Amino acid sequence: MRDIREKPILVAALLGCAAAALVHPPAARAARWGADYFPNVPLVTQDGKVVHFYDDLLKGKRVAVNLIYTRCTASCPLETAKLSQVQRLLGAHVGKDVFFVSISIDPDHDTPEVLKAYAQKFHAGPGWVFLTGKMEDIRLVAKRMGLASLTDAASRDGHQPSLMIGNEPTGEWMRNSAVDNPQFLAATMANFFHWNMGPSKSYAEARELPSVGQAPYLFRSRCAACHTIGNGPGIGPDLQGVTERRQRGWLARYIAKPDVVLAEKDPIATALFEQYRSVRMPNLDLSSGEVSDLIDWIGEQSKANGARTDVAVKNAAMP
């Protein structure tokens, strides 16, 4: 409670509260959320370089910050896969106009070497740094960044998949879900940082959005960051024809509890884990009904793509 009384809390600013923006002009916000608030603790990058959190990673920069750890079986792989898509969508902006910062909450395991391998698995490019350090320093950073949660203390897998977007020079901060739609996150950053991403169109020209059922929504929101159906492998395998290659019971169990199936050293799960650079499929906590609907929909999409025999042949050779 001592810190809460002595330091202003980030709540309004970090949530992008309009009232706070009106009360505190940009100069005042920048002073409020600057060197006196953010810790300048030392951290170590995936390349083994020692950096200081405020001076080297925040000061004078626009950033997107999240917490991860490489042994995570829940949201972390999905978070990182989604950010990888955002990185591609933003293109040259990353590393120039905005910097991605992913901090491990498992520093005893996540050495610079482990983080470097993890970054490579998810195709992290320039402008995206992965960090480790002392646990007490990481806890302080997480708290001051508004990324700490009560569930973190009980279980790392319970940590909140939040993404803190900030403009340090102006003192403006906003929290988003790190597992949101990548196009939405990219557009949110572009708007927040006032980038010109090309000519805007009138709403009158907008296409009518198609009705989306539960299964396609689940695939787009949970699976599409790593998988395609008929467009080749990504971070994970192409799912074209997977409902024909795998027994339905095995597929349902693997989708529902991939961490358990892998821990049992299932030969198919182990072969996929090794083939796709040891990227863990996250446990998305899907219900049996959601899993069943997803399998049916993937099968339907595979049949609709039936003309793509070249893709099906390639996928048939997978373990």
Residue ranges, per PLM feature:
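Structural microenvironment flanking redox-active thiols in thiol-disulfide oxidoreductases
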Residues: 80-124, 128-131, 135-140, 247
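Short active-site neighborhood of thiol/selenol oxidoreductases, capturing the structured segment around
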Residues: 55-77, 83
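Gly/Gly-Pro-rich "capping" loops immediately C-terminal to redox-active cysteine motifs
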Residues: 228-260
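Short, internal strand/loop/helix patches
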Residues: 117-160, 268-275, 280
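Electrostatic cytochrome c docking/interface patches
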Residues: 194-219, 235, 318
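C-terminal capping alpha-helices of c-type cytochrome domains
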Residues: 137, 141, 160-171, 184-195, ...
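A short beta-strand-turn-helix
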Residues: 42-62
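The canonical Cys-X-X-Cys-His
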Residues: 73-76, 163, 215, 219-229, ...
